[in-house]
Amino acid sequence: MQHDLPSRFDRRPTRQIQVGTVAVGGDAPISVQSMTTTKTADVEGTLAQIYALAAAGADIVRCTCNEIEAAEALAHIVPRSPVPIVADIHHQYRMALAALEAGVDCLRLNPGNIRKPAHIKAVA
């Protein structure tokens, strides 16, 4: 199947950040990111998916952190991961704090779900 895709994409100017060892944004190379589908509390199953994603070319992997068991599991997952781990946070700002304590490389907050200024300040 033939696609008429441009050979070059125009990129918006953005600020570069580091997600673990991977530069993202700015003029950094485009990175591949994916997300696990396991319950993060399943440490071995989640690590198996992370290793498979890394072998397939993922530079960064996101794991959901929607309950305390997931946050606790991240403390065991992060040091064994071959790629930087991003905690995907949904509604509870305390999960973001727990994920940071577990050593994740970055947080992804669903826009608008953490609204109280005190909660935003605690995470920032």
Region annotations inferred by a language model:
Residues Q2-D4, F9-C63, E67-A124:
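Alpha/beta enzyme core
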